[in-house]
């Protein structure tokens, strides 16, 4: 009997001890919260040279955190919510360095370089990989640039701000470059070759994305112009919430629910990409951003005149680096060619993009009206796209004396039955491509009926446009089509920016959602 009681007592003691140990471990774990950083910080990363760089993460509330790189050391304490951040002093070009973050634990990142960092953003033509572009075998074989670093940010659509993402920095090699943005890589490669400094590229593009998905929702709600767009989404969101809570759905309802779930998590819902993608690295030290997007907003081109500048301005304010350079790619030529002049939503979107240069400082546009493919929305020539973007950065940020801006319409005057046009950024003059005859011009009178026009380059660089069918011209358009046939370049090899001299309402003027 005594032996049985002794055995039971021992068993109870063991159970109590185990429970006590588990409680102690749980308590210790609750108190201990390791220092953590989002994956925008990691081995092989590039820090922006010549400016302060923010480093941030989480730890236990009140925990002391020390961040060290080179001869710099910065101390801080985690706030009540566990968040902390420090600002590194400006670093010169160089490396490799070690970045050490020490709290109750220690995190160490190695092979950290200091150079030039650029965001590569937009939709599918920015996301488009080296593997899917022209000559991927040759491009990958040559991609031996140990000081060029890349990181891909995955596509997550949500209304909840994301602190981290699943990705890491990689060194540019023939094995790693294939899955990276082709436009981003060719842009970065040109900077690297021209400047001989480390380059860091952050690719967060999402194919098919709409501009409003990259913008904070409260900013959209603050402007009446976007009320119809937000109301449309509010209706869908309410329908999704109701259907999600319903029971015993039939097959059609299940299909509808799945489709709506895709919309709720997708790349068109306002603020979805801002929260799910951009927020995870917003504030990381950068030089600037390149952008290739607009196809998904072409049906609302007039709205884009305000939406696109709003997005750029909001990014700049939240990044806290002032008006950092923001360069974009104008939409390429695409779709079937038209035999006669016609209205075009793609032309109106290009116009909205060009207008943004007048709205915001430190912006620029790479015109690629000669690079597109009529039957493919994803032209495979990404080398020239990257180079034209690089021209802007090299000339404006790095002081390289090269042509960078496409010729652009400035003014027009009527001279009899002709219109004489003046342009900026022509440089050394004009060069028609392929044939001497200037193609792509259309002219109309006050009746707004456009016909193809003849054009002649004058000695002072102006261009004279006319048609025997229009006795009293009122407007001229150039390359005003989804897929225009046009052939005018500056002698520097940059195509004339598509334009119109009129302000007549276009086909997208009333489209708001």
Locations of regions flagged by a protein language model:
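N-terminal secretory signal peptides that target proteins for export/translocation
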Residues: 1-11
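Terminal low-complexity, poorly structured segments
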Residues: 2, 18-20, 33
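Generic detector of low-complexity/intrinsically disordered segments
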Residues: 8, 24-26, 101
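Bacterial N-terminal signal peptides
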Residues: 13-26
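Bacterial Sec-dependent signal peptides at the C-terminal "C-region" and cleavage site
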Residues: 24-34
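Cell-envelope and extracellular/periplasmic
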Residues: 32-513
